[in-house]
Swiss-Prot record:
Binds 1 pyruvoyl group covalently per subunit. It is a peripheral membrane protein. The gene is asd. The lineage of its organism: Archaea, Methanobacteriati, Methanobacteriota, Stenosarchaea group, Methanomicrobia. This is Putative archaetidylserine decarboxylase proenzyme. Heterodimer of a large membrane-associated beta subunit and a small pyruvoyl-containing alpha subunit. It comes from Methanococcoides burtonii (strain DSM 6242 / NBRC 107633 / OCM 468 / ACE-M). Pfam families: PS_Dcarbxylase. GO terms for biological process: phospholipid biosynthetic process. Its main location: membrane.
Amino acid sequence: MLAKDSLSWVVTVVTLTGIFLTAAVLTGIDLVWYLFYMSLFLTFFVIWFFRDPDRTTRICDHCMFSAADGKVMDVSGRRVCVFMNVHNVHVNRTPISGVVKSITHKKGGYLPAFHKDSERNERTVTVIKSSHGEVNVTQIAGVMVRRIVSYINVGDELVNGEKIGMIRFGSRVDVTIPDDFDIACKVGDRVYAGETVIAKKKNFKVRK
């Protein structure tokens, strides 16, 4: 399954590959064949990058799930930061059930998402009003293709694990944790959107 709004990318690279193949067959020029193989590789890469595998999120009102696939790069100040490398699935999911209170897009720079100054990068901040309080999900653009795509609107009711958007080609997602939750992950952990529990309500035992 491909991510939402990825069809134009796939159509573009497939069309380009078809053009180079036709030109290579008709001309037999080595350079054109080289361009064909490069575009074929690009086609496979784009399809692989925009993959959107099915995920099953357990029903749990006392759990918060990772909003992104990747590695936990920081856990501090009631915030969990997940860095998504280029090989990770880039579709993001809501960490908790609730209603979308606001979506704010902020312009900024395009430093690598793991850089200490990436706090100034372009970002989209989604505030979700849950039964446990407000949760901020911040999608931060990286250094490559700088596009944050949102699948949701203000007023939407979300269920934990529901898709909320994606960031293209390397990025980071930060999630704030309510005070009545204990953080259940640590720096270096590999997490999966909608599947890995990153926080749980205090005195609540997560079922394995």
